[in-house]
Amino acid sequence: MPAQLIATVNGGTLDQYDQASEKLMKPGFQAGLLHHACVPLDDGFMVIETWESEQAIQDFTGSEQFQSAIAASGMPMPDIQVRPVHNVVSK
């Protein structure tokens, strides 16, 4: 069942996001990722992703590569919420 990841990074910058994304968006690393969007906030940013399953999210966010990329960028650790998805529409 698809799942949604919502990661809020209070105090993070878009430069930090770009730096971490450069490492995290390499082909093959994000197996199961269907959609990704980054939304600027007044004090940080939010990443909204749709994945093939909650397990795919856990595999990604629990990986050494994920933890290392976040730490190397200098951004605060994201507050991550995961929820099941009822319906996905792509156009």
Q: What residue ranges belong to the model's regions?
A:
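Short, non-transmembrane amphipathic alpha-helical segments
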Residues: F66-S68
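Short S/T/G/P-rich N-terminal loop/turn motif that feeds into the first structured element of a domain
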Residues: M1-E64, S73-K91
